[in-house]
Amino acid sequence: MIKQRTLKNVIRATGVGLHTGDIVYLTLRPAAVDTGIVFRRVDLDPPVEIKAREENVGDTTLSSTLVKEGVRIATVEHLLSAFAGLGIDNAYVDLNASEVPIMDGSAGPFVFLIQSAGIVQQEAPKRFILIKKTLLMEEEGKWARFEPFDGFKVSFVIDFDHPAFKGRPQGVEIDFSSTSFVKEVSRARTFGFMKDIERLREANLALGGSLNNAVVVDDYRVINEDGLRYEDEFARHKILDAIGDLYLLGHTLIGAFSGYKSGHALNNKLLCALMADKSAWEIVTFEDDETAAPILFTRPLTAA
C-alpha cells in the first residue's frame, strides 16, 4: 500500500516576507491522517486556520494567497511545491505573519526543513487525483492544460523578448515518474525585472526582495553575482510554482500539466474548472501494489 505521509518532528525557521519585508516565524508540524496541508495564523487570537485548497485562494496577484474572512496567507506556492515534491499529505504550517517567508526564492530551503524534520508514513492509503480527460483554460494568449498521463509530468513555456533570455531554453518538460523534484526543480529561484521591482516597491510590494532571494534581471542581463543555478532556471521556477499551485487540489496528481505563459491566476482557474467537472477526474489509491504508483518520491524514513 502506498501510504499517506506527514512529518516526524516539529521544525522551525525564520525568514523574510517577500512583499511585506517583515520577519516571519514559520513552524511545520505533523498532522493526522486526512488532515491535508493546513496553514495557521498563530499571531491572531484566536488563531485562524486555512486549508490549502483551490477554493480558498482569494488573491493571485504575484503569488497564490489563501484568504478566509479577511485573513490572508500569501506566497504559499513554494512551500506547497516542497510538500508536493516530497509527497507530504498532512501537515500544519504555523505563521506569525500574513506571508510565508521567501527564504532563497526557491523551494530548496523548505525541502531541507522537511527532510530535517523527517518524513513518516501513516496507516492510511495515499489518495491521488487521476486526470481522466483533457481540460484547457485560455486567457489573453496564455493557457494552462491538464491531460491524462500515467505519471506526473509538467511542461512550461515562457516567452520573454529580453537579452537575458536570449539563447536560454524558455521551455522545459519534466517527467516525475523518472526524475527527482529535489534535484531537477526545487532549487530554481523566483525571478524579477529591476524595472518592475522599483514599481512594486512604490506600491509597497516586494519590500523583502533582494539578490539573496530572487534572480534579478536588469535591461541586459542577470545581475546576481553567482548567475543561474540551472541554464533554464527561469522556466524551471515556473514549473516549481505550478507544482505548488496544483497541490492546492489537496492530493498528488496523476496526469500531465502544460502551461504557456500561465501564472497563479490561470492555474487556479484551471483547478477550479477541474474540480467542477466530476467527469474529468477521480480519486485513486494503490492499496495492493506499492510499485504501481507512477510517481517517484523520496523514500520516507519509517512508518508512523
UniProtKB/Swiss-Prot annotation:
Pathway: Glycolipid biosynthesis; lipid IV(A) biosynthesis; lipid IV(A) from (3R)-3-hydroxytetradecanoyl-[acyl-carrier-protein] and UDP-N-acetyl-alpha-D-glucosamine: step 2/6. It catalyses: a UDP-3-O-[(3R)-3-hydroxyacyl]-N-acetyl-alpha-D-glucosamine + H2O = a UDP-3-O-[(3R)-3-hydroxyacyl]-alpha-D-glucosamine + acetate. The active site is at residue 264. GO terms for cellular component: membrane. The keyword Lipid metabolism applies. Pfam families: LpxC (PF03331). Zn(2+) binds at residues 78, 237, 241. Belongs to the LpxC family. Catalyzes the hydrolysis of UDP-3-O-myristoyl-N-acetylglucosamine to form UDP-3-O-myristoylglucosamine and acetate, the committed step in lipid A biosynthesis. This is UDP-3-O-acyl-N-acetylglucosamine deacetylase. It comes from Nitrosococcus oceani (strain ATCC 19707 / BCRC 17464 / JCM 30415 / NCIMB 11848 / C-107).
